[in-house]
Amino acid sequence: MYKYKIIFIILLLIICTSASKSEDIKNNIETLENYLNTIQNMSFTFEQLSPNKEKEIGWMQIEKPNKLRIEYKGTNDLIILSNSYYLILYKANDDIITSLANDGPWSILTKNNLKFGLDKNNLDTNGVVSNVKELKINKVNHIFYEILMRNQDKQLMPPIILHTSSNPFKINGWTIFNEKNEATKIKILKQLSFNKKSLNENIFKLSEQDRLKGDVWEGPFNKPQ
């Protein structure tokens, strides 16, 4: 009889622990949703570590919905722009434009009214949270979310791992993976603005006139015109 009591207590503890963990995950997902959905626009500098281990410093400006601009410090002449339809890659030195479908895990920063879930079969969500890990680093609670965002066809894309911390809740960076499972890591260095009341919409444009003049840079870096 004593043995069965012990087994019952152990099973009860496992069930309670599992229920508590499930509730923690739901709370963490809700916290992330609420934070991301408060973002209207945001700019920051970042450090990028590419699959080839090359480090670069960049600047990103986002505005919802679907607008993004990225520039890099130094000799890297790449400018990345996005709108509701296209992701535009512009090589300034050669004046070459490449347009791609604006479908990628970066949409976690640019979509409105994000909703995440745990069920891969629920097509009403923007993404599926496949894993959540909490770590205490220097007395600060860090939460890592592994999320599979959906593309425009509702298909799940390669994961983005979002690194956040609490008090106050903020995004510290993320890791994205290509089709070969190679990782590109982004670390936010400094937030420059958050929900600015007035934003120059020309930031997200690249006019032919500016291209001809070579006047294409909008970021904080001292780039040659």
PLM-predicted stretches and their roles:
Residues 50-52, 93-95, 180:
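Solvent-exposed strand-loop boundary residues in beta-sheet-rich modules
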Residues 117, 122-219:
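Gly/Pro-enriched, hydrophobic low-complexity segments
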Residues 15-24:
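Bacterial Sec-dependent signal peptides at the C-terminal "C-region" and cleavage site
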Residues 1-2:
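N-terminal secretory signal peptides that target proteins for export/translocation
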Residues 60-111:
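An acidic-aromatic
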Residues 34-54:
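A short, Trp-centered hydrophobic/proline-enriched beta-strand micro-motif
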Residues 5-15:
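Sec-dependent N-terminal signal peptides
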Residues 38, 61-67, 82-86, 164-171, ...:
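Short, solvent-exposed coil/turn segments at beta-strand boundaries
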